[in-house]
Amino acid sequence: MIVIMYQQLIAHFDSLGGRELKFSPGAAVFHLGDEVRLVHLVRAGTIHLVRNQADGSALILQRAGPQSILAEASIYSSSYHCDAHAQSAATTWAVERSELSAHLSGSPSFAQAWSQYLAHEVQRSRLHAEILSLKTVGARLDAWMAWNEALPARGLWSHVAQEIGVSPEALYREMAKRRRS
């Protein structure tokens, strides 16, 4: 079901006038407060939607990989409410917000595929919120691993720490504790 939904959504995106944009690792796709002009479908790489906290930490709100729509709720907003940065070399298909909005109004099949995508993203966001509500690093890590099945390569653990809302050091301590057990 989800695969079919994504295929329909991507087919609609491909039919819209847009342009391919490339981002190098670390490059900004947009910043907090920027006017929303484009909606990005990630074709390759990973782009993070990030909210920077007052204490200097960053909370990842979305890890948009291939076939993900970056900051999909931005179509309903005049400005972005967070930052987006490429975590790796990334390519997007960027569609004008106004064209996407018009297509949603004029195509029931696209509106249905869009609604299904948003519903799936709500489910993922609820899981993320649940992880962040857990009190211990261990509980957060357990919940994250239940959803993702395995940790990424060791060099990417700091990304997991950001995603579950803990410092990299706290995650490393938890990992060391588990290795000793």
What positions do the PLM features span?
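Short, flexible helix/strand-to-coil boundary loops that buttress conserved ligand/catalytic motifs
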Residues: 53, 73-74, 96, 104-107, ...
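Phosphate-/nucleic-acid-contacting segments
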Residues: 135-181
